[in-house]
Amino acid sequence: VWMSALFMCLGLGYIFNFLGVFLDVFFSIFTGVPATDMNPVMDALDELTPGMVIYTCLIAPFMEEFIFRGVLLKKARRFGDRTAVVFCAVMFGLMHGNLNQCLYAVVIGLILGYVAVRTNRIFYNVLLHMAVNSFSMMLVLVENGLNVLGMSAMAAAFSVGSFIMILLLIAAGIYFFF
C-alpha cells in the first residue's frame, strides 16, 4: 500500500498541479491578475533558503499529518471512514490557501486519508508526505538551477520528462493499488 500510495500521490499531485496552473492562467485572462500572483508560493520558490527546504520537506509534513490525519481524521471517523477522509482532504486542500495548491492537496489528502484509515496510524502518512514534498522540492531545485544557468529549453525538457515519469508512476500506483 505504501509504495502504490507514493506513486499515486506523486503522479496525481503533479497532474492536478498542472491543472491548477492552467486554471490560474485561465482566471488570469478574465481578472487581469497575473497568474504568477495567484499562487504566492511561486515567489517563495524563486528564493529558496535552506530553512525553507527543511520546513517544506520535514517540518510541514509532520505538522500537517498530525493535524489533518492524526487529530481531525480521528475525530471525523465517527461519521464514517469515507466521509472523514473526504472531509479531511477538502480541509487539507483549503488550508493551502490558493486554487492551485488546493486542487492537488485535496487529491493527495484523499490518498493520505485512505492510508491513515487502512493502517490506523499516521507514521506512514508522515513518510509519504515527506517523500512527496521532497520530490517536489527536488523538481523545483533542478528546474531553478537550469533556468539560472540559462538553460530554459533544458528546463522545459526536464518538465516534459517529469510529466512522462509521473504518468508512469500513476500507472504503477494503479496497478499495485487495485
Stretches found by the model and what they are:
Residues 1-60, 73-77:
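Juxtamembrane helix-loop-helix connectors linking adjacent transmembrane helices
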